[in-house]
Amino acid sequence: MDIRIGNGYDVHALAEGLPLWLGGVQVESPIGCIAHSDGDVAIHALCDAILGALALGDIGKHFPDTSAEFKGIDSKILLSRVIELVRSMGWSVGNVDITIAMQRPKLAPYIVPMRECMAKVMGIDVSQVSVKATTTEKLGFVGRGEGCEVYAVALLVK
């Protein structure tokens, strides 16, 4: 059995009055991510981790923010396309682990729905998808509520 590990990271600035999408789930919040797509920073980091595991570049290479095709796109579609590419190469997702850093809102009520949503898009069991949320104890741009960042790791198997 061959295995590959990929690491992903994404960050977005936050602004009032925008929808907040994380892990394919709309989170009730007065703030959301400024982005070309729907701004789902969790799925973007996950896509980068999966692509990175196979040395296929990053999300910007496959879905450039300069393309009108991806303006406002649902990030679940991007994840679905990444999974199609991975499967076409004979690989499958073993598991993923995602850490979301945001000062607010509290994300605990959304963790299970995020896991379920991303598992469904990837065609894997929810037990293979870990999502954790943390704050930065009010430190840095995340702590000041100016942005959110996500770290993701993906294990691929063949």
Regions found by a protein language model. Name each.
Residues 115:
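Generic structural marker for isolated residues within well-ordered, non-membrane alpha-helices
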Residues 142-158:
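C-terminal edge-of-domain segments
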Residues 125-128:
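Short acidic capping loops at alpha-helix termini that bridge into adjacent secondary structure
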Residues 1-3, 157-158:
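N-terminal charge/polar-biased segments
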Residues 131-135:
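Pyridoxal 5′-phosphate
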Residues 118:
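Glycine-rich, mobile lid/loop segments that gate access to catalytic sites or pores
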Residues 107, 139-140:
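Acidic pyrophosphate-coordinating catalytic loop
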Residues 2-112, 122:
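RNase III-family endoribonuclease catalytic core
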